Design a protein with these regions (language model features):
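Membrane-proximal helix-turn-helix segments that form the acceptor-binding/catalytic region
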Residues: 6-14, 21, 35-56
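A short, histidine- and acid-enriched strand-loop-helix "catalytic/donor-clamping" loop
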Residues: 17-36, 112
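Acidic anion/phosphate-binding donor-loop and adjacent secondary structure
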Residues: 31-32, 76, 80-100, 111-116
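A short, active-site helix/loop in glycosyltransferases that binds the activated sugar's phosphate group
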Residues: 45-76, 81-86, 214-215
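Nucleotide-sugar-dependent
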Residues: 112, 159-168, 175-195, 206-214
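Nucleotide-activated donor-binding/catalytic signature segment of Leloir-type glycosyltransferases, i.e.
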Residues: 134, 141-171
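A charged, aromatic-enriched C-terminal amphipathic alpha-helix characteristic of glycosyltransferases
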Residues: 228-234, 241-280
Length: 285
């Protein structure tokens, strides 16, 4: 079982044994030289096609490599919630008050687009609230601490996952999951925040122009916005109504909660089928 492109490449150079490959990041897209990036993309696709099975953590990664021509030896296993979350009861929420919407970010606080979106909301909508749950990255500490000057900004600090998630999501109306589009990887990734939003029936806001935005709109569970564009953010917030928010909440409710959990049933079934086929091949030989 090979994790990441660098490990898989070293393995392929040294032996010809069968392998299962997992890709959770498009690591070669971080290379600034486009020609080198293309070489590694060619190698990556060869490794994928040569595998017994390739496990992707996002359907977007398959789309990046192969457009709509998905190879048969691939499977998508997203970063869903740990089944341990079932040990903690979901806390019922009050109906959303559109005069005082509680926006929330849950996770490592570091992205510039998150700062810009939060600043725009805090500055232009003093009636709404913005809550941060998670530690602030040291590189962005100054920026985000500056937001504390707004009376409608709340920095809650770190939290325990998954123990604290029910309380956190019961305290917010909309969860923010916007990321900087500087890296190609972000455009195609599928963060676990998507599955938290569905599980806790909370509308999600993501970055326009990403695979995540496509999925959120397809499922009808949230909104996409250009977080770096002040006019876009203001227009988005002004467009929020009780009806549109309830429509997204209902979209979350329609999805079976089991599909948000990291149970890996499909993966185990595929692995079992591979083992059966391998045994049949050996018996024929």
């Amino acid at each position: 079982y090979l994790f990441s492109l660098d490990v898989a490449l070293m393995f392929r150079l040294q032996c010809s044994k069968k392998y299962i490959y997992e890709e959770s990041d498009l690591v070669h897209t971080y290379i600034s030289n486009r020609w080198v990036q293309r070489v590694f993309e060619y190698i990556d696709k060869k490794i994928i096609k040569g595998s017994v099975l390739t496990v992707f953590t996002s359907q977007g990664f398959i789309k990046y490599h192969f457009k709509d021509d998905t190879p048969n030896n691939t499977i998508v296993v997203p970063n869903r919630l740990t089944p341990e979350i079932l040990d903690y009861s979901i806390i019922p929420k009050d109906a959303i008050n559109t005069s005082c919407i509680k926006f929330g970010f849950v996770g490592a606080v570091r992205f510039k687009s998150l700062y810009r979106l939060a600043e725009t909301i805090l500055n232009n909508f003093p009636n709404h609230e913005f809550h941060f749950y998670g530690t602030i990255n040291s590189n962005r500490d100054g920026d985000f601490m500056e937001l504390d000057k707004f009376q409608n900004c709340y920095l809650h600090g770190g939290f325990k996952n998954p123990q604290d998630l029910p309380h956190i999501y019961s305290s917010i109306d909309i969860v923010i999951s916007t990321y900087d589009l500087v890296e190609e990887n972000v455009k195609y990734a599928e963060p676990n925040k998507l599955y938290e939003a569905i599980y806790f029936e909370t509308p999600i806001v993501v970055t326009t122009g990403t695979y995540l935005a496509e999925k959120v709109n397809e499922l009808g569970i949230g909104y996409d916005v250009d977080a770096m564009n002040e006019k876009s953010v203001i227009s988005f917030v002004n467009s929020l109504t009780q009806e549109s928010l309830q429509k997204r909440i209902d979209g979350c409710k329609r999805i079976d909660k089991e599909k948000t959990l990291n149970l890996n049933k499909e993966l185990f079934e595929r692995l079992d089928n591979i083992n059966i086929k391998q045994k049949n091949i050996h018996s024929i030989r």
